[in-house]
Amino acid sequence: MKAIATLPEAEQAVDEMTALLERLAGVLEQETRLVHAGKVRSAAALAAAKADLAGGLFAAGERFKANAKFLQQSVPARCKTMLRLQEGFRGILQKNMIVLATAHAVSEGIVRRLSGDLARKAAPQVYGATGRTTAPGAKQGRPLALSRVL
């Protein structure tokens, strides 16, 4: 990691960080829209771009931390602008995480329900001591195979 020592380097570092934040925010917003619309496969295609941008943002953030004092002294206005952008990015990231968590919970619920239904169908229908049908035992369960090809 190269130290930032001049004003042009400081301006370039802030500009690069700002560009990374804006591009990653755009990818996250697109992913959020796609998942919200149920287009999970299209959203999954953004994973590589999202990972690359996140890695670049992490590296730029580490460089920023190492040179924070110089950056705040040499380009304070750009640093303030970047902080405002970062606050907006946090909101976008939070919304994205909520949408992804919701989609995950819904899909997990569907798989659990399907697994339970299949286990009930595979188990013998017998009556227990109380006169009611018994729930299938754990040994009655079978593996559930899913095809990712729709």
Q: Model features per residue range: what roles?
A:
Residues 1-91:
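Extended, charge-rich alpha-helical scaffolding segments
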